């Protein structure tokens, strides 16, 4: 099942590569808002997914979980040397990542929530803004990592992009404490604290 207007426009623009699941459609028309949530499989995106589902239960709207992906070598590399089997493999991997993220977040239980999922080909910020195009939509994102000035230059913030460009409200769900601790371990701070504590 798909809902007409917005999805059709996305398909015509080549953004939507695959619709995965749709649970209990109770008439979310194209003019009714949805909660669009960016999913990557990270702890932050899983926290955003939980926030989106809780808000959907409260407001009785549909959740659209979106995982954005690009072909290996990004779009420019793929345009230079197109290879349809590589594109298909990239899309299939994105679909598998999205299913895995949903399974990790909810163990297959979406109790009372209308949920649709899409793997969308394109740059993350731009694609999420395009998906959250209805009046009344709400875009929910995980706050992401604190990369520092150089990291932000190399990998600009998806959240900042969406806040600047989205036509709807954007909610940035704070990183869960476990994610902050894991990032500290990756940078070596946590290891030093563990050694100093013993």
Q: Where would I find each of the regions flagged by the language model?
A:
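Structural beta-alpha unit
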Residues: 1-31, 44, 106-139, 177-184, ...
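Small/aliphatic-rich secondary-structure junction motif
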Residues: 8, 26-84, 165, 179, ...
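General small-molecule cofactor/ligand-binding pocket signal
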Residues: 64-66, 116-120, 171-173
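Short secondary-structure boundary segments
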Residues: 67, 143-144, 174-175
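A short acidic, glycine-rich active-site loop
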Residues: 83-97
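Active-site phosphate/pyrophosphate- and oxyanion-stabilizing loops and adjacent acidic/basic residues
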Residues: 103-104, 160
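Glycine-rich, Arg-bearing micro-motifs that act as flexible, cationic patches
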Residues: 139-161, 180-182
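Short, flexible loop segments at boundaries between secondary-structure elements
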Residues: 163-180
């Amino acid at each position: 099942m798909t809902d007409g207007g917005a999805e059709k426009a996305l398909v015509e623009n080549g953004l939507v590569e695959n619709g995965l699941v749709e649970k209990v459609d109770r008439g979310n028309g194209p003019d009714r808002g949805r909660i669009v949530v960016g999913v990557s499989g990270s702890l932050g995106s899983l926290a955003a997914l939980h926030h989106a589902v809780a808000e959907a239960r409260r407001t009785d709207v549909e959740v659209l979980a979106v995982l954005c992906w690009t072909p290996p070598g990004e779009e420019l590399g793929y345009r230079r040397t197109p290879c349809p089997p590589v594109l298909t493999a990239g899309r299939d991997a994105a679909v598998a990542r999205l299913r895995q993220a949903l399974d990790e977040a909810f163990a297959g239980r979406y109790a009372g929530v209308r949920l649709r999922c899409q793997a969308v080909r394109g740059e993350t910020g731009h694609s999420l803004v395009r998906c959250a195009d209805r009046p009344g939509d709400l875009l929910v994102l995980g706050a992401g990592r604190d990369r520092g000035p150089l990291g932000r230059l190399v990998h600009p913030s998806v959240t900042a992009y969406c806040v600047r460009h989205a036509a709807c409200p954007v909610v940035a769900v704070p990183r869960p404490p476990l994610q902050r601790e894991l990032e500290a371990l990756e940078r070596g701070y946590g290891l030093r604290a563990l050694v100093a504590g013993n």
